[in-house]
C-alpha cells in the first residue's frame, strides 16, 4: 500500500495541476472516479490489470474501452500511466487527486459516528464548530454505532476526535493500568 501511494502521488499531482490549469477539476474528478471504479473492480484486475499475457498498451486500451466516454486529455493521462505499467495504481491516483482537490477547494469530508441518530440541529452545530476549527467547508456523513454507548467520534481527514463514552472508558482503563 505504501508503495502504491508513493507511485500514485506524482501522477496525481501532475493530473491535478493539469486539471486546475485547464479549469477542469470537477470533470477530471468525475472521470477519474469512473476509471478508478473500473480499475479497482476485482474481476477487471484479475482478468486485465494483473494478466501477464497482455501488454501495457492492451491493458490500457481495455480500460479506456470499459470506461467509455472520457476527456481526450484524461485518456492521454491514462495511456501514460498504463504505458509505464502503473494501471494498478489508478485507484490510488484518483484518491490522491481528490485529496489535492479538497485541499485546493478548502473542503473536508467529515464522518460523524454517534451512538444515536443525530437530528439536523445537532449536525448543524457540529458542522459549524468544525468549519470554524478546521477553516474549511464541511461535508458531513453520519453513521450510528451503538457500541459507542454515548457521544460521538469525528473523523476529518487525518484528524480524529473521540468524544465517545467507549473512548473515554478506554482512556480511563489505560490510565489506571499504566
Swiss-Prot record:
Topological type in the membrane: Peripheral membrane protein
Subcellular location: Cell inner membrane
Record keyword Cytoplasm present: no
GO molecular function, one term: proton-transporting ATP synthase activity, rotational mechanism
Record PROSITE patterns: ATPASE_DELTA
SUPFAM superfamilies: N-terminal domain of the delta subunit of the F1F0-ATP synthase
Record keywords: ATP synthesis, Cell inner membrane, Cell membrane, CF(1), Hydrogen ion transport, Ion transport, Membrane, Transport
PANTHER family: ATP SYNTHASE DELTA CHAIN
Protein name: ATP synthase subunit delta
